[in-house]
Amino acid sequence: GVQSSASAVAGAAPASSLAAAVRAPKRRSADQPSSRATMPVAERFVSINGEGTCAGKLAAFIRFTGCNLRCGYCDTMWANVPGAAAKDEAPEQLAAWVRQTGVECVTLTGGEPVLQPLLPQLVELLLGEPGPNGRGLRVEIETNGAADLGELAALRARVGDAAPGSLSFTVDWKLPSSGMEQQMLPANFRLLGARDTVKFVCGQGDLPRALEVARQLDLPGRVPVYLSPCFGDIEPARIVEFMQENQMTWATAQVQLHKVIWPDVERGV
């Protein structure tokens, strides 16, 4: 995930040729209803991916408004609240924008993107794009673990290798410090494989639970697992120590790069 404002993004954009792609969308007022044929976009921009298997790589981010959770440490609450400012854009418009950016990695985030009824349509369009190098786009959906992934997993299985692009899921398991663990859907995690990622954002006291859940869901060796610190609540070194103490050779400790590079920027990075 990633965040920031249009002016901040313009200053942080990796290349001037991407400047047009980094513009924040025009906003509709909170009381203007979203068209059924469009999706509510809080922001879209190009930056580096801050976490996961594509960390450090340029990516086109599309952030949708709305979320079904209220995590205590949420850093994108501005996009989650009812009536959050957004621009209504059709899937075809978003696919055209991604094409314009000239980047290979695409991250669909939020909010909670899986709540968007038109997300499967957008994903199918993106998977059909040839991408800048003719190898297709690497499409990633960042999701909170509490929205059913069944339809999207079925789409991935149906499309298979017929489309040039690839689809992966980065799925959170919310730990006790989030206040949302009871909302997790274990069935989602049975749909995941080697191309996907399970992410645990850890606060003080969460690490033993993360290990317990990883084992219960049979994640080690089946799905890549990332452990990230809840900034300001736990030192990253403690995560490394816990991994050492428990021989967690199958897990990866990771800090969010965008928060290291732009610690005071909230949107567009």
Please identify what each model-predicted range represents.
Residues 6-8:
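Residue-level detector of structural "landmarks"
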Residues 11-21:
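Short alpha-helix boundary/capping segments
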Residues 18, 29, 35, 39-46, ...:
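Conserved Radical SAM active-site core
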Residues 22, 26-28:
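Alpha/beta catalytic barrel-like cores
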Residues 48-50:
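A detector for short, charged/polar N-terminal pre-domain segments
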Residues 52-55:
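S-adenosyl-L-methionine
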Residues 95, 115-269:
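Conserved AdoMet/S-adenosylmethionine-binding subsite of the radical SAM
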